[in-house]
Amino acid sequence: MEIKGKVFIVTGGASGLGEGTARMLALRGGTVVIADMQVEKGEAVAKEIGGAFVRCDVSNEADAQAVVDKAVSLGKLMGLVNCAGIAPAEKTVGKNGAHSLALFSKTITVNLVGSFNMIRLAAEAMAKNTPEVTGERGAMISTASVAAYDGQIGQAAYSASNGGIVGMTLPIARDLARNGIRNMTIAPGIFGTPMLFGMPQEVQDALAAGVPFPSRLGTPEDYAKLAVHIFENDMLNGEVIRLDGAIRLAPR
């Protein structure tokens, strides 16, 4: 699809990978609706890029529908990028006992259920679009993690949530093929995001050195470039792309 003149939803667009993607889509001429819990930051980014902001808990049906409704009101909704997520760390059995079931459930709810909630509602709206000359009515990108494949110690909940995103990528693409809607997933490796920047500098340096090539942290721009390419390349569908510099995570 051509990005210019289309409307895109970016969840988690107030910071990190989502913010980078929202900015790049806007630079390409897209209108972006940022959906995030960070109101002040989200509104500021939306204003800078000429988009819109909607406060949204992606796992809440009413919140998600409000985002989709806002996007449709601005024009032709053709894209969704799911970047909202959490990454708590807790061992199955740790010093304080068994893993919190509430924390496990919350991680699944935000990361997996939240992604699917946005997908199903955005796809419903896209299915009503007049198709492009290629027959396409929209495309969606979710964010998983390499932890879906080689999760580390303390990542049971996080890995499970991302494994679910990976697992539903193909069946959703098959479900929506008749509607002319594509579905893809990006599984980033170690990226420089607000979450990682909260770690000590020596830890950040060690993580970057562990990436075979290029030996650096990924950037929001790296992610955004791939997201834009996915939107523009109609043959990319039903696949998970690892964006990780060939890293395979060690146990810890």
Where in the sequence are the language-model features?
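Canonical Rossmann dinucleotide-binding motif of NAD(H)/NADP(H)-dependent dehydrogenases/reductases
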Residues: E2-V33, I172
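Active-site helix of classical SDR
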Residues: I119, S161, T169
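Catalytic Tyr-X3-Lys loop
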Residues: M78, I86, G97-I119, M140-I141, ...
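Conserved mid-core segment of classical short-chain dehydrogenase/reductases
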Residues: A87-S105, E124, K128-E136, G154-A157, ...
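C-terminal substrate-recognition "lid" of short-chain dehydrogenase/reductases
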Residues: T219-L243, R248
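Alpha-helical segment proximal to the catalytic Tyr-Lys
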Residues: E124, A173-D175
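Short, small/polar-rich loop/turn modules that mediate ligand/substrate recognition or access, typified
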Residues: A177-R182, L236-E239
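Residue(s) in the substrate-gating loop at a strand-loop-helix junction
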Residues: S145
